[in-house]
Swiss-Prot record:
It comes from Caulobacter vibrioides (strain NA1000 / CB15N). Residues 49-139 form the ATP-cone domain. Belongs to the NrdR family. This is Transcriptional repressor NrdR. A zinc finger (unnamed) spans 3-34. Its cofactor is Zn(2+). Pfam families: ATP-cone, Zn_ribbon_NrdR. The keyword Nucleotide-binding applies. InterPro entries: ATP-cone_dom, NrdR-like_N, RNR_NrdR-like. GO terms for biological process: negative regulation of DNA-templated transcription. Negatively regulates transcription of bacterial ribonucleotide reductase nrd genes and operons by binding to NrdR-boxes.
């Protein structure tokens, strides 16, 4: 594995163990050139998934992009990062077990929304605001009412 610090082509594995949920192998590595230490995760990939965007463009499924988008939704919320990791692992397993090689981005988006709804209401609304492309505050109000998350108040924003 290439060193992320100096770019040296080789690194030594110093420690290897299963991750908390057992879905990955966590490896501590050290670069023999610069002495830099870093962590890598090794995961099983059952099949190559292609995501079909709304525009029709196709791109390989990127687990890290999913983690980042969920991370943005849960940022500064009292959500344990391990719960987020388990949630993402569950979504990836569901996607892989569908048996399809190409999936619409809407499938991923709906899975994330469903998982976030049970994890944290604020993260759910944050994600929905981007996924459903809210343009103004009335979009938020309508969504909150439809989802039963509104307190019923008609306050000016």
């Amino acid at each position: 594995m290439r060193c992320p610090f100096c770019g040296h082509a080789e690194s030594q594995v110093k420690d290897s163990r299963p991750s908390e949920d057992g879905a990955a192998i966590r490896r501590r590595r050290m670069c023999p050139e610069c002495g830099g230490r870093f962590t890598t995760f090794e995961r099983v990939q059952l099949r190559e998934l292609i995501i079909v965007k709304r525009s029709g463009r196709r791109s390989p499924f990127d687990r890290d992009k999913l983690v980042r988008s969920v991370g943005l939704a849960t940022q500064k919320r009292p959500v344990d990062p391990e719960r987020v990791e388990r949630m993402v692992n569950g979504i990836v397993r569901q996607l892989e077990s569908m048996g399809e090689t190409e999936l619409p981005s809407s499938t991923v988006g709906e899975m994330v929304m469903k998982a976030l709804k049970s994890l944290d209401d604020v993260a759910y609304v944050r994600y929905a605001s981007v996924y459903r492309d809210f343009k103004e505050t009335s979009d938020f109000a309508k969504f909150l009412t439809e989802e039963g998350l509104s307190d019923g108040g008609e306050e000016e924003l």
